[in-house]
Regions:
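Short, His- and charge-rich active-site/binding loops that engage polyanionic ligands
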Residues: 138-139
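Short, conserved charged micro-motifs
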Residues: 64-68
């Protein structure tokens, strides 16, 4: 296998993003750059220099349409990784892979090798805010069921580290996919025709930070991203401020190193 340098990884990810963008335009599926990718677009007009992720989000119905279309197109390189397509995958979002590549990321998780990817997040609409706290707890338990023992120790408090280690030992034989089902059921039960809120449920560990008034993400605009014009919510400032605070000020060098990922990527022979 051929080792991929950072710029080569970026080119492969952007080609994958171009494929997703063209697929969404072809099938009239609205999506937007999300999380750190949205931040990168607004602050850097491209990817955050010390980050190597690309994230997009769609409303749940569009999310399911996009995944179905990509699966049915059966592209020779680009494939869907989700709970339904993999026996080991446990996240409540999907990834689109470039299967001509392989990555290793064994720093945090007892995980399988996979491919360079773009994460695809569903946006759900709801009224019952209790699902946010419930899903947050399931996400925390799911993470403990899959991280390496060393990652359960944070060093923030002896008591908290002790409790996390106890939970880690209790959960190490639990399949993390169990928590996917719990979160998925929460989302389905919360579906309503008169929602007040929207956001990513069971996606990460931000809790109420990821909850916004309904239709926050409905209206999209185009912004520059790595020489392309790609969609972000018109209310991007509301999202970025709520998620990151003073988002136009880059973090310190130390924090940039903390945020950076430890992925080694290779092109298959």
């Amino acid at each position: 296998m051929q080792y991929l340098e950072k710029e080569e990884i970026k080119e492969i990810q952007l080609a994958l993003l171009d494929y997703i963008n063209e697929t969404c335009k072809k099938h009239d599926i609205p999506y937007f750059l999300s999380y750190g990718t949205m931040l990168g677009a607004i602050r850097h007009k491209g990817m955050i220099p010390w980050d190597d992720d690309i994230d997009i989000s769609l409303y749940r119905e569009d999310y399911e349409r996009l995944l179905k279309i990509i699966e049915e197109e059966n592209h020779p390189r680009y494939k869907v990784l989700s709970y339904d397509t993999s026996s080991w995958y446990f996240h409540n979002f999907a990834s689109i892979l470039d299967t001509s590549t392989v990555i290793e990321d064994h720093v945090k998780y007892k995980r399988h090798d996979t491919s360079l990817f773009i994460d695809v997040f569903p946006i759900d609409r709801f009224t019952d805010l209790s699902i946010v706290d419930k899903s947050y707890k399931y996400v925390a338990l799911r993470q403990l069921a899959y991280i390496k023992k060393s990652r359960a120790v944070h060093g923030d408090s002896k008591l908290k580290d002790f409790l996390r280690l106890c939970s880690w030992h209790a959960l190490r034989f639990v399949n993390p996919r169990y928590f996917y089902k719990k979160i998925d059921q929460l989302v389905k039960n919360a579906a309503t025709n008169t929602p007040q809120y929207e956001g990513g449920i069971g996606i990460g560990k931000e809790g109420m930070k990821e909850v916004f008034p309904v239709d926050t993400f409905k209206e999209l605009i185009l912004t520059e991203f790595e020489g392309r014009m790609l969609p972000v919510p018109k209310k991007y400032d509301q999202f970025l401020t709520q998620m990151y605070g003073d988002y136009m000020t880059p973090p310190s060098k130390e924090m940039q190193e903390w945020y950076s990922h430890s992925i080694k990527a290779y092109r298959k022979s």
